[in-house]
């Protein structure tokens, strides 16, 4: 086993990812877009600020997961794996194109919330969330396949 020197920054990053891997962290963050849209629609800026603070602190609020079996835990591991491999998430290859398509969907949902167009808000929120779950689902499938091919990578 190799002993590596670590910095405080490395410790924070490691702690961040371990805690964020708790499925409660991921599942509670899925409510972020609907909460933002609600706050904008109702012009509730205090609630919007609260959502921002919660979203920022969320990855540190939960203890590390006991095991790696939960799907949302694997979503976080897949995201970290993707970042460590320096694979971008905003290009036109699959599944990244889903993230690219999510930008205008979420943007239009936000615009519709500002304009107080409830049907458009709801529709584009659903479209955005479907694209996001499709994207992370594809990442998890790649991560799981990589795990089966080479468990030590």
Where are these regions (language model features)?
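Short amphipathic, positively biased membrane-proximal segments
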Residues: 1-153
């Amino acid at each position: 086993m190799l002993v590596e020197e670590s910095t405080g920054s490395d410790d924070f990053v490691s702690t961040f990812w371990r805690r964020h891997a708790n499925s409660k962290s991921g599942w509670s963050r899925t409510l972020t877009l609907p909460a933002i849209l609600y706050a904008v629609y109702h012009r509730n800026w205090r609630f919007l600020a609260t959502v921002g603070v919660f979203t920022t602190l969320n990855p540190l609020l939960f203890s590390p997961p006991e095991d790696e079996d939960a799907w949302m835990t694997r979503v976080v591991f897949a995201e970290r794996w993707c970042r460590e491999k320096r694979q971008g998430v905003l290009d036109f290859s699959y599944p990244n194109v889903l993230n690219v398509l999510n930008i205008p969907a979420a943007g239009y949902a936000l615009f519709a919330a500002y304009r107080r167009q409830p049907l458009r808000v709801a529709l584009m929120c659903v479209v955005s969330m479907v694209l996001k779950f499709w994207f992370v689902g594809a990442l998890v499938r790649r991560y799981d396949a990589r795990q089966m091919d080479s468990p030590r990578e």
